[in-house]
Amino acid sequence: MYMGVIGKSPEIEILRELRGARILITGLSAVAGVDIARAFADIHARLIIHTTDMQPEVTELFALLSQNAAEMKLYTNPIARPEDSIRLAQNAQQAYGGLDAVINLQSISSAEMQSIATQEQVETLIAAKLSPLTHITHVAANRMRVVLSEGSVLNILTAPKPQNAREAAIAGIARTALAAMTRGEAGQWADQAVRINGVGPRSMSAQPAGATLTNEPDIAALALYLASKRGKTLSGHVFDADGLFAGGA
């Protein structure tokens, strides 16, 4: 939804506005978040990058990002436990004296899809995926409230394109959980000028409300738009993604 309005190429005023913006990106890996990080680095934002993926291609990416970003800080500790995700959000807030936008990345892998055999396993997996996003969203939004700062949080949960009805059902449950979290958080922070949105697996049971995000440059353009003043009227929405980050863990 709304991608027809947002477009795929950020307008020049958005790029100027976000120059020097303080951006936290969590969950970056070789298969998720590369184009998003590049998009913000290219407009000379100040980046805080979280990753646990230290493959050679990822370390090469960091070198490239550091050349273009106004500043960059890197965190590599796992954030699966609540205390770890909270600590990351707090450290990120302190890095540049606050945050203007947060992009949290999570993906359900093909292997995880295939390993699920029960409803309980589905619920456990989705809870594990959404928990860090929820804690980081709370800390970031609360800090924005305290300092009377407008801000944006975009929580991205993607899954590979379903190969059968069972996988489609899992993706649908994941989207429903993300949508509930997004609406709840958006409602909680609505009067504080903090915007909460999501990107989730496209529902196979309904026609999408707008264009579907089919590649990461689409998501990068969306993240730029939502972080800018142009996106200040959008909160509580979950945008459709189709089969992204299929190799993610």
Language model features with spans:
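Active-site loop of short-chain dehydrogenase/reductase
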Residues: 21, 71, 97-101, 144-159, ...
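Conserved glycine-rich Rossmann-like NAD(P)H-binding loop of the short-chain dehydrogenase/reductase
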Residues: 44-60
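Amphipathic alpha-helical dimer-interface segment in Rossmann-like NAD(P)H-dependent oxidoreductases
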Residues: 90, 127-148, 186-187, 191, ...
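Conserved mid-core segment of classical short-chain dehydrogenase/reductases
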Residues: 78-90, 94, 107-124, 167-170
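Rossmann-fold scaffold of SDR-type NAD(P)-dependent oxidoreductases
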Residues: 26, 99-110, 129, 155, ...
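C-terminal helical subdomain
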Residues: 2-7, 191, 198-199, 209-247
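Canonical Rossmann dinucleotide-binding motif of NAD(H)/NADP(H)-dependent dehydrogenases/reductases
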Residues: 9-48
